[in-house]
Amino acid sequence: MVIDAHAHLETPIHGVTPDPGRRRSTHLLMWSYEILGFRNPLWKGEPPGPARALIAMENRLRLSMGCKENLLRYMDRSGIEKSVVLPIAPFSTSWDYLEACAEEPRLIPFASAFPAPGWEKDLEEAVKRGCRGLKIHPILQRVAPEDRFYFDLLEEFAPRRMPVLIHSGEFDYYVVRDGFAAYGDISRYEKLVRAFPEVPFILGHMGLYFPEKALRLAERYENVYLETSFQPLKVVREAIRVAGVERVMFGSDWPESDPRYALRIALKAAGGDEELRRRLTGWNILALLR
């Protein structure tokens, strides 16, 4: 069974409205990046200013594809049986995702919480109703990784021993230089990871432009898992070497990326090793979904 560990549904951020009529993801810069296997011959590390602006624009266009009908269509085309879908409160809520997944067994909803009155009760109810994990996104939520809220949130969530998928990597989302990209710096996540050793933390995108930071954290903490979206084959192979075959998993971050490309890299990383292939493309995330 192939499971995409990282996908999203309707997330109306910065005025972007999901449009079922928008069905293609061939935007020049992002499409080129996918075709090249997420290798970038033009620059190393973070993109320069003009490229950042183009990436932000293309991200908004791709986000507008993010409805359930399109996700299922991309899953069918890519040979994906199930997808973990991740809300980002306050833009999309646990309730939005529970409703979207209610009659679609191929979608596995996570919960999300935001520092607003009543979040504790909402989180408890979301888990009771079927959410299988928690999504944290410091950049888009505009909450610093060191903020007391995340520690209170994990204190509440940790006894369930469910996975927490946290965005990792400094990145401008949809608006260039809005001042919050630094919240994705993985070095700022260590206190949270260390404080809750019983919680499986999945680093979404494995650090984006800074995978070495994700690898260092995974090397130091056994409760850190690595998700492969936007990472080239070389980095995925290194992740398997550093973290081991049980702590790396395929994810695409759909609709920001066509799942075919990240899945192709995961399959190449497995080579002819059938057990590794199954672990990367389903077993590892399935083992965390209690």
Could you describe each region identified by the protein language model?
Residues 133, 143-249:
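Catalytic pocket-lining loop regions of alpha/beta-barrel enzymes
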Residues 2-5, 85-86, 110-111, 135, ...:
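Active-site neighborhood of phospho(di)ester-bond hydrolases with catalytic His/Asp-centered motifs
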Residues 52-63, 85, 168-180:
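Glycine-rich phosphate-binding "P-loop"
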Residues 6, 75, 126, 134, ...:
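Conserved, mostly hydrophobic/aromatic
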Residues 67-71, 93-98, 118-121, 186-189, ...:
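Alpha-helical scaffolding within the catalytic cores
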Residues 6-12, 167, 205:
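Histidine-centered divalent metal-coordination motifs
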Residues 81-82, 86-172:
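Active-site gating/metal-coordination segments in enzymes
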Residues 1-5, 13-73, 77, 82, ...:
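Mid-to-C-terminal alpha-helical segments outside catalytic/metal-binding sites
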